[in-house]
Amino acid sequence: MEKKDFNQLALDQAKEFGGKLSVVSKVPIETRDDLSIAYTPGVGAVSSAIAKDKSLVYDLTTKKNTVAVISDGLAVLGLGNIGAEAAMPVMEGKAALFKRFAKVDSIPIVLDTQDTEEIIAAVKAVAPTFGGINLEDISAPRCFEIEARLIEELDIPVFHDDQHGTAIVVLAALYNALKVAGKDIGDIRVVVNGGGSAGLSVARRFLAAGVKHIMVVDKVGILAEKNADQLPPHHAAIAKITNHENRTGTLEDALQGADVFVGVSAPHVLKPEWIKTMADKPIIFAMANPEPEIFPDEALAAGAYIVGTGRSDFANQINNVLAFPGIFRGALDTRARKITIDMQIAAAKGIASLIPDAELSTTNIIPNAFDGDVAEVVAESVRHAAEATAEA
């Protein structure tokens, strides 16, 4: 079977269609009366109504179903700092996925600045147009402050998908992997390799879900509270709530006796011989792209029980598209002001529930994006959580 060159196919598609998106009117504009209703003079009445009651913007405009996909082009996929223009195809792709999987309209916005204050100001300036903000490909540690301040200062949900979308899908995979392995979430030991935005979010969501023993490993080794004064603030903060034994050392040291490895780091950093030192039935989530921390065949040969990656050509693909469309669908439907941790945990449980227990196996712990109505199940889970936590 001939291997497809997806890079060339993507270039050909972009050239043929001139991008992935278009704007389509929902209302007819075929006659003079149509024009008078859609634009002047009729539209003035709609604007006047909103001027009297700003909450009507949700009922009378596209705000209620529209999300901004915003990037500064600094940390795009595995390409790095490629700038605003080069980030545009990725943002278009994200917007297309919102529409395909959750019927959410979204607008790609790339910012020609990488200054934290300017990014925050720009997002706040355009926020009245949108029902939610999806931050994309903004590098750590800047992304932490940008997201936190926007959440605090805006009255619409703000979500950095590179952090939390990844964490939510990994958590969904963990729920089902533990069922297959016969382990309890409160008893396991987890090692998260990678102290960037995704790794720190994984650690925090695992803690919220009931994991008690987590160590985060970065280039300096195991993050420990006793070394907090030598760490950057975001690493010091995670060290204070993980690694309760205050262990230090390398990734190899951290893995001894661990049940779960979560890699959001770099290719080939997990050695097969280290898996042999892990607990019985080790679970490996190796999600570096395009090449994982260890390839599944190597991990399985070394004794891994379950292996997941970010790639579609291996079993158990851990893909953000399982999460973000449904999360925003649920948040928009309830007009939630925030996407809380409870809503994110609910989303993970919703994703996990899509595979019946009878169908779970070592090679089937996470659904495919095209299996059933993933986004609607996630959206329903998020809606219930929003209502339960008074975010709706």
Region locations from a protein language model:
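Solvent-exposed alpha-helices and their adjacent loops that cap or buttress functional pockets
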Residues: 15, 58-63, 99-100, 125-127, ...
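Rossmann-like adenosine-cofactor binding region
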Residues: 235-306, 311-313
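General beta-strand structural signal in soluble alpha/beta enzymes
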Residues: 108, 134-137, 158-161, 192, ...
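Glycine-rich phosphate/diphosphate-binding loop of Rossmann-like nucleotide-binding domains
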Residues: 77, 84-102, 154, 160, ...
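N-terminal ligand-binding/catalytic initiation module
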Residues: 1-158, 379, 385
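Adenosine-phosphate binding glycine-rich loop
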Residues: 161, 286-392
